[in-house]
Amino acid sequence: MVVKLYGQVTAACPQRVLLCFLEKGIEFEIIHIDLDTFEQKKPEHLLRQPFGQVPAIEDGDFKLFESRAIARYYATKFADQGTNLLGKSLEHRAIVDQWADVETYYFNVLAQPLVINLIIKPRLGEKCDVVLVEDLKVKLGVVLDIYNNRLSSNRFLAGEEFTMADLTHMPAMGYLMSITDINQMVKARGSFNRWWEEISDRPSWKKLMVLAGH
């Protein structure tokens, strides 16, 4: 059965789910929700996602929202299909979960407001919060140093295999790398930059960029 994904393919959270689908070889259909016209806030979409965000999925009678929950669900449902994203043992899965949580609580809390202020607001003709941006860059640098140290002795965040721990970072990283200052911050950290170059060379990422019009 084809999974229906409601969202905008250029948005980071739908991209997280799409990357999972592409890594697992899951058939999907994208139902476009236009974020620029706030379609996600309309009553019909609020029935799918009561907080007015994207993505949401429909898989037959099964419905789910929140990108990380969706990605984990399909990585589990299709554990034996495509890339193993969850880990090969209980201990490995715990490390995958650990670094996926790091993405949520340490990385994304900085990446998301940076993307909003440096990419989305200028596109909408709005002013960014310069003071906030500079503070976020400093904090991001500290986080990237920790990642760089981790990746100096590990090929990927959870060890020697690409997993959900890596995948969940990719949409925001794609946006951050288009920001000159942050691109330079990444390239100044050799192990972190090596990791990004490797994961952004995966077929799933290249296919996603085509879907997103890049």
UniProtKB/Swiss-Prot annotation:
Disruption phenotype: Great reduction of anthocyanin pigments in the vegetative parts and brown pigments in the seed coat. Accumulation of unextractable proanthocyanidins. Its main location: cytoplasm. Residues 89-214 form the GST C-terminal domain. It is found in: Cytoplasm, Cytosol. CDD domains: GST_C_Phi, GST_N_Phi. One of its GO terms (cellular component) is plant-type vacuole membrane. Residues 2-82 form the GST N-terminal domain. GO terms for molecular function: cation binding; glutathione transferase activity. Induction: By the fungal pathogen Verticillium dahliae. Gene3D superfamilies: 1.20.1050.10, Glutaredoxin. It catalyses: RX + glutathione = an S-substituted glutathione + a halide anion + H(+). GO terms for biological process: anthocyanin-containing compound metabolic process; regulation of flavonol biosynthetic process; toxin catabolic process. Glutathione binds at residues 11-12, 40-41, 53-54, 66-67. Belongs to the GST superfamily. Phi family. Involved in the transport and/or accumulation of both anthocyanins and proanthocyanidins (PA)s in the vacuole. Functions in the cytosol to maintain the regular accumulation in the vacuole of PA precursors, such as epicatechin and glycosylated epicatechin. This is Glutathione S-transferase F12. It comes from Arabidopsis thaliana (Mouse-ear cress).
